[in-house]
Amino acid sequence: MQITVREALRDAMQEEMIRDDKVFVMGEEVAEYQGAYKVTQGLLEQFGPKRVIDTPITEYGFAGLAVGAAFAGLRPIVEFMTFNFAMQAFDHIVNSAAKTHYMSGGQAKCPIVFRGPNGAASRVAAQHSQNYTACYSHVPGLKVVAPYSAEDHKGLMLTAIRDDNPVIFLENEILYGHSFDVPETIEPIPFGQAKILREGSSVTIVTFSIQVKLALDAANVLQNDNIDCEVIDLRTIKPLDTDTIIESVKKTNRLVIVEEGWFFAGVGASIASIVMKEAFDYLDAPIEIVSGKDVPLPFAVNLEKLALPSESDVIEAVKKVCYYSV
């Protein structure tokens, strides 16, 4: 059986709304229009306007409303049309949702999911293409999820909705329409468990979200040069499955990290720092990080392509750590 990422997310929200009447969805155009990307399709008809709520165009306003609802015991799912617009709600996410559990000594909970597309799409220019993975991962009190497959989107969304504290659920606009094979039943997937999608012995490639496809495609090409890549899909950035990464590096002795976001203070830099501390003696080459270029993402299609990680970038990085002529 195959379903799209869009359908996987919708199914997860639908199942949790049936299971728990405290769960509700809110955001711009999530009800009548059924979501800017049709992720909430059919939910208004099934659950009505009290649980599928169209909001004004004010991220600061409806994010604050949702955080208050979570403090009161409800379980809001907040859709941002894009995480670029969530900048308007940053204060509510970082200062209210993320910190209250700690500041209350564990007495107050904030069961809320902030979800929507993150990162580049296709020619939506600099202000609509930013990747916020590292930004939210930097904040104590936030769990950060960035899945690739339909099964993982659904399983991790089920877990996110049931979590008693805030989850940042980073989706990808391009992945919404991609279909994946899925089992008949998808159970909640625990946070902090990476997935080895391709076993190998020559080099470890660590990545997440849509860059997983880039890594898998590069690994297939590199196999022709007898370079056997192990590809790890992180699935969740925070908590990070450090153990799976370290064990893989101990086996392959080489590491390439692939992320769409910017290099400086990025996810890759944090992972590289951890591996250097925990597995330095196992490394046979410096760690390579493939990332987006340090520029606002251009609108021009040729420049946009050059600013984002490519399959050839991954291949070049892998050959470099394997001391292979390029």
Curated annotation (Swiss-Prot):
Keyword Transport part of the UniProt annotation: no
Pfam families cross-referenced by the UniProt entry: Transket_pyr, Transketolase_C
Cofactor annotation: thiamine diphosphate
GO-annotated molecular function: pyruvate dehydrogenase (acetyl-transferring) activity
Residues at which thiamine diphosphate binds: 59
Domain of life: Bacteria
InterPro entries associated with the record: THDP-binding, Transketo_C/PFOR_II, Transketolase-like_Pyr-bd, Transketolase_C
Record's keyword terms, sorted: Oxidoreductase, Pyruvate, Thiamine pyrophosphate
Coiled coil: none
Alphabetized PANTHER family for the sequence: PYRUVATE DEHYDROGENASE E1 COMPONENT BETA SUBUNIT (PTHR43257), PYRUVATE DEHYDROGENASE E1 COMPONENT SUBUNIT BETA (PTHR43257:SF2)
Assembly and binders: Heterodimer of an alpha and a beta chain.
Protein name, per record: Pyruvate dehydrogenase E1 component subunit beta
Gene name in the database record: pdhB
